[in-house]
Amino acid sequence: MMKQVFGILAAAMIAGLLALPVAVLADGHGFDPDEPPPEGKGSVYGTVTARPHKDYVKKAKELGSKEDYDDNDPYAGSADGKVVYNDTMVNYDFADVYAILLNPAAKPGKVHEVEAEGDEGQKPRALAVAFGDIIRIKNATSKPLTYFLADINGDSIQEIPLLPPGGSADMTVELVGDLELTTDEDDSLITAVLSREGLQSQRVRSGSTYAFPNMNPGEYDLLFWFWRLGILKRKVTVEAGEHTDVDGVLSVDTVVR
């Protein structure tokens, strides 16, 4: 009888897990591609992954298959052929990456938080924002900081007044392009900022699912971005009553810089 109960519970748990939506949106609502979109609407969803260069992975696997591989070799793998990450490398299995949809109908004004933490550096390391969004900056260090947002490919720049220790301020994004948010006093406090008009984004763990539901039919630009790798660009057509599946893999041999 007990085995039967456990069997029923296990089946219920598995059924419950399988019924979970493939993505949890920023507002806490789930997205399920098996559920039809609202009338007249469509959606875009998929998986976005960041990975090392395929040649790097190949060499790591080859070295990992040798019993006498050198632990100090920057390409060294493990005995099972998996890449071993050291302190100077990015573990792309855990990197936060962005799925971005450029939607002319999107309204700006979303608030993004950035915090300078002294010895801990500045978090987050990257932001995807829309023109007109707000970056809320908190100075959690022990020194005054002068923040500015600059176009890395041009001369455009915007600043906020000196921010005292413990202070915070809002900066409305007035620039479009590939930007950096940093300070005059400490250039180690830096955040890569991708800014576009009509930008909608989801920040997810590498290998996770993103979703943009309830979209009007039409053609959109879809971007996948990780600040260490660059941008992967796609065109996507949203059709009424349809969920469009678009996956993205970011690596040094697939992105546009």
Regions of interest found by a model, annotated:
Residues 21-27:
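Signal peptide processing junction and immediate N-terminal pro/mature segment
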Residues 27-257:
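Extracytoplasmic copper-binding redox domains, predominantly the cupredoxin/blue-copper superfamily
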Residues 1-7:
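Positively charged n-region of N-terminal signal peptides that target proteins for export
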Residues 9-21:
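Bacterial N-terminal signal peptides
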